[in-house]
A protein has these predicted regions:
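Formylglycine-dependent sulfatase
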Residues: 14, 29-450, 459-482, 486-496, ...
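N-terminal secretory signal peptides that target proteins for export/translocation
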Residues: 1-9
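Bacterial N-terminal signal peptides
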Residues: 12-27
């Protein structure tokens, strides 16, 4: 076989594999004998991939994480797990199992914008509730302010200590944080901490200010442990979505954790706090005697926010929160279920928060719906990970889509070990002191061909190998094109919802308006001509 034939054969094989993986992500039901397990999703905020000891951080970086490290030793650790590039998209992806632009949850939900998770979106709570689960949400929601967007409007029976914003939003009106706030500009009106039950009006329990930030996770931990103890003996299984505020900027540790890290920084102390609270929740599960019937999954919403260093997590990857580079969305993930997940397991499967809804559905013995909450056809971007968890097989996913803000076409695509990067916004070399990172960087795309990285041998994305002499890999383009085609075609059948959070990023040019107006008039003319012909 000629060298060209070999390349062609290899390309066709990869394209075929992509086409198979990109088809409907229907979960294969997990074989979990006996009673349906309780399921607990633990999510921390902006925690760095390298903050945990099992990922190279922990004590070596001055902030030990013995409880999360133990969780990994007793369960399974994921190496190629992805969130999304920022908070709201990351949380929407975990709750819905859909690319954020499908739900319209593409960027950070800001105070005063209203709106939020659309009424029609199906959540993991909806799916598990239909399978007979009691459902409980506690902590950071960040999926909008509207009543129709609340957890109790999306499948959760009960919600406690609910926070609607990114943590730094609670500093906006604080005179110490913003002493130069002009009196002529009204201070933002933030909705405070909420609680409620499904079918009844929710209520604001208290307002939240800077002074409350250090102890928010204390309330989240307490509510979580109280719920576990109250429902441990139930015949009905429960699903809990527990969402900590640590380690989002500003990281202000609770008083009991001040100075407890070896590094003696607020961020380090907050890492110790997060780890301790996770450990206490796991201890509560053990003490309640339900560890063998409870799946616990820990992960993070997005990559570390390097823009706000030193008040940020650490990552060995290129880029930061808000970018399509690995640092924007590669996150730690650990699954724990004694007696079902073998201790010390590791996975290099490509997977992410998108896959949790299909995985939890499979574990619960149910499947994902074909219609949304409004009765319209829907699709999911979620792949069942239960074969990976239980050692019976691999995930059907072999690709990942990277999108920032309102990108419709992917800003980067990973297939197998190769990653093509098209969107270079906010990019900077690892460990540089470049200030224009993340959201602050200029929007820019590659001219003709993408950057190409081998993430297996170069996870830090140092070496673009697309057109280098010795490792030339331009033959991979049909592979990425196949994924791009599949994603774009899916929008025709399942159109994305209206974006829920919009703000001006500029520029809007007169020439753009004129081109759009000319196109609109041309389309109207064609429609009139078609009608006349009929």
């Amino acid at each position: 076989m000629s060298s060209w034939s070999m390349v062609k054969h290899r390309t066709l094989a990869l394209v075929s594999a992509v086409a198979t993986a990109c088809t409907a992500a229907t979960p294969v039901l997990a074989q979990t004998p006996g009673q349906k397990p309780n399921i607990i999703l633990l999510v921390s905020d902006d925690t760095g991939w390298g903050d945990l000891g099992v990922y190279g951080g922990g004590e070596g970086r001055g902030a030990p994480t013995p409880n999360l490290d133990r969780m990994a030793r007793e369960g399974m650790q994921f190496w190629d797990f992805y969130g999304q590039p920022s908070c709201t998209p990351g949380r929407a992806a975990m709750q819905t199992g859909r690319l954020p632009n499908r739900s319209g949850m593409t960027t950070v939900a800001a105070p005063g914008q209203g709106g939020g998770l659309p009424k029609g979106e199906v959540t993991v709570a909806d799916v598990l509730k239909s399978a007979g689960y009691s459902t409980f949400f506690v902590g950071k929601w960040h999926l909008g302010e509207a009543g129709y967007a609340m957890p109790t409007a999306h499948g959760y029976d009960q919600m406690k200590d609910v926070l609607l914003y990114h943590l730094n939003a609670y500093t906006y009106g604080d005179p110490q944080s913003n002493p130069d706030w002009p009196p002529s500009i009204p201070k933002p009106v933030l909705i405070g901490e909420l609680e409620g039950v499904a079918g009844q009006p929710y209520k604001e329990v208290r307002k939240i200010g800077v002074a409350d930030i250090p102890t928010l996770d204390d309330g989240i931990e307490t509510a979580s442990r109280t719920y576990i103890n109250a429902h441990a003996g139930d015949r009905t299984p429960f699903f809990m979505s527990i969402n900590f505020t640590k380690n989002h900027q500003p990281t202000l540790p609770a008083p009991e954790f001040a100075g407890k890290s070896q590094v003696k920084t607020k961020y380090g102390d907050s890492v110790v706090e997060l780890d301790t609270r996770v450990g206490r929740i796991l201890d509560t599960i053990r003490q309640a005697g339900i560890a063998n019937n409870t799946l616990v999954f820990y992960t993070v919403d997005n990559g570390a926010w390097q823009d706000v260093y030193p008040d940020s997590g650490w990552t060995p990857f290129r880029g930061t929160k808000g970018t399509d580079m690995e640092g924007g969305s590669r996150v730690p993930a650990i699954a724990w279920w004694p007696g079902h997940i073998s201790p010390g397991g590791t996975s290099w499967d490509i997977c992410g928060g998108l896959d949790l809804i299909a995985t939890f559905a499979a574990v619960a013995g149910t499947s994902l719906p074909t219609k949304d909450r409004e009765g319209k056809p829907t699709t999911f971007d979620s792949y069942d990970l239960s074969p990976v968890l239980f050692g019976t097989g691999k995930s059907k996913r072999n690709f990942w889509i990277y999108q920032t803000e309102d990108e419709l076409a992917p800003g980067a695509i990973r297939v197998g070990k190769f990653k093509a990067v098209f969107n270079l916004r906010g990019d900077y070399p690892p460990f540089s002191d470049e200030s224009h990172t993340g959201w602050r960087g200029p929007e820019r795309y590659v001219a003709t061909v993408p950057r190409l990285y081998d993430l297996q041998s170069d996870p830090g994305e140092h070496y673009d190998i697309f057109m280098t002499n010795w490792t030339e890999k331009s033959w991979t383009m049909p592979v990425f094109d196949a994924v791009m085609k599949q994603v774009l075609e899916s929008y025709e059948k399942f159109p994305p919802r209206e974006a829920q959070s919009l703000s001006y990023t500029g520029p809007i040019r007169l020439s753009q308006y004129q081109r759009l107006e000319a196109l609109r008039q041309r389309l109207q003319s064609l429609q009139r001509g078609s009608a006349a012909a009929d």
